Amino acid sequence: MEGIELLNFPLAFQNGSARLLTGDLVVRDIECWCHRKAEKGGVTPVMAVIYFNTGADAIDYVKIKAHVAARAGVSYWVYEMPVDASTTQVMSQVKKLNKNPQIHGILIQRPLPHQLNEPVVMGYINPVKNIEEYAKCRVNNIAADAFVRLLTKYGLLESAQQARIQIVGFGNIITKEFIKQMKRQFPYVNASRGFDPSYDASKDEHEALQMEVETPRDSIIISELHRGPGFIKSSMVKPEVSVLLDLGFYATEKGVIGDLSHSLFDRSSLAIAPTPGGVLPILLWIMMERTIKAKNTVAKEELEGCHCLAM
């Protein structure tokens, strides 16, 4: 699969009545910034990716990131680990990357093999270089960052603060860290592993939702279901849903497809961030942006003799 395939949305999407929230406007801003900053200081930013060859999708993800890194002016170093690697082995590799001053950003590509202790492995990455969960050493989940940037670009951030946000699924992008940050940033967030068309907001455990349940609100659905391409049909989405953000990813013979059925793109009441072309390209470009910003932090700490890189 060519990396560009994830960045562009199919022409078929444009024929529907739904409003498309495409990532290209946000990507354009980040790309321009990367071109200005990548070589500043005479040092090329380096992003290191640890991955496990769990299948064709894993290799596709590596290639897609390589394509974006080349466009951003970021060197891209890939470290393949055995699928049966132990937590200790992966931590040993992370330690080497933490200590290497040539490496500025570190990403461990999901999904991780089942035998690994994911929180321990992910938590071992130096925060300075952890481009998925930190920005300038502050906790800032990359997917939540991409979500906010997309809504801001389309003037929807303020309405999102008043909407019910239903996060459905779990996996490579919807993680515990993503859900935690979304609940910190937005008052009416609920998360579940599956998609329930009969979802009743009055049954929500989220305190803010319980207090406001009688107030009519628009709803936003964010999905990463791993139930197959086009799993969410139009009949499953209630009228009060105003925004759908598709984080599903399926590489098929027809190209990349997300969780949303094409029938949803015919609903004029919806704003949709599709796969491909919606949130996912923004995620990729934020990885590059954070790597470039981390370059300056790493250089500064090396100059000052800081020992926090020696984890």
Where are these regions (language model features)?
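Short N-terminal or domain-adjacent regulatory/targeting segments
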Residues: 2-42, 138-153
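Adenosine-phosphate binding glycine-rich loop
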Residues: 15, 20, 24-36, 41-47, ...
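N-terminal glycine-rich anion-binding loops that anchor highly charged ligand groups
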Residues: 37-46, 54-71
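Short beta-strand segments
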Residues: 51, 107-111, 168
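Glycine-rich phosphate/diphosphate-binding loop of Rossmann-like nucleotide-binding domains
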Residues: 54-64, 138-247, 252-266
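Short beta-strand elements in bilobed, periplasmic/extracellular small-molecule ligand-binding domains
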Residues: 69-83, 187-200
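Phosphate/diphosphate ligand-binding glycine-rich loop within oxidoreductases
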Residues: 73-142, 264-267
